[in-house]
Amino acid sequence: MLVAAGLTAGLAACDDKIEPFVAEGFTGTPVAFDASTVSSEALPGEIKLSWTEPAEDFSYMQIRYFDPLSKEDVCRIVSKGTTGLLVENTRARFGDYTFRFQTFNALHEGSRVTEVKAQSGPAPVTLTEVKRTKVELTKDQLSTDNQEPTEGPIANLLDGNTNTFFHTRWSSPQVPLPQYIQIDFKEEHEDFAIKYVTRNIGNKDGFPTAADLQISADGKTWETVASLSGLPASSVTEYVSAFVRPGKKFSHFRFLVTSASANSKYFHMSEFSFYDVEVDVYDPETIPLDE
């Protein structure tokens, strides 16, 4: 068993924390690795290298590259028969990474070095919710496309009372879903979340079970920015959404119910709230790097 840090000059550049490995068998002159067999895939924050197993014999192969993020030379050792390497914690911002392949025999004599250039996909952005601020709404900002005329006015969604409710039309003539709650804001919004409370009722029908969250800048052209499913179908149950980042500002919003419990052609709800959300964005591809 040999540890990379204890090898001869051919491995001098290897990281001393590399895993131990066995180098045995072939003692002939190692043939240079054919770099033309290597393909690369740019993954999110990673580089995947794949190659055809060399026909030539060798004991192990060293793959070296410079990591511009850590500003360190990195050495990976793979055994014969290995046909791929996943390089983690990489960045698209650095462009080409140069990988140097070198085969070795059991005497740690190395072949000529061959090079392959490959690029990383962008590292994933991390989004962290900082706070939510409830938007105070008035009844004149609310509307629906299918109000039940005998009960459940839409203004009840804002009264803070879970014993009152809003109801779309259950009386004849019924129309099929989808049906919506619309908010016309007096200002623009962007990152947001919603909360609502289901109706206080013993019946099992009419609870929203799936809905689209839609936005519009003009109240005419609508875009779905999130779809919700598995919504609660039980009495006086609070639902709180994850935050939504539509990537644009809007001044009109719809909670568009696409299905309801018991296959109802209507839906009901007790309370509805809309929140502005402050989101912290950590983008590994754009943050300043230490000098």
Question: Where are the regions that the model predicts?
Answer:
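C-terminal motif of bacterial Sec signal peptides marking the signal peptidase cleavage site
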Residues: 10-13
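Pro/Thr/Ser/Gly-rich low-complexity, intrinsically disordered linker/stalk tracts
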Residues: 15-57, 112-137, 277-289
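Extracellular low-complexity, O-glycosylation-prone stalks/linkers
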Residues: 55-76, 209-215
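Short beta-strand segments within Ig-like beta-sandwich modules, predominantly Fibronectin type-III
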Residues: 75-82, 231-233
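Beta-strand-rich modules
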Residues: 87-115
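Disordered, acidic Ser/Thr/Pro-rich linker "stalks" and the adjacent N-terminal cap
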Residues: 119-186, 199-205, 280-291
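A short beta-strand element within beta-rich, extracytoplasmic domains
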Residues: 189-203, 255
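Trp- and acidic/polar-enriched beta-sheet ligand-binding modules for extracellular glycan
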Residues: 204-291
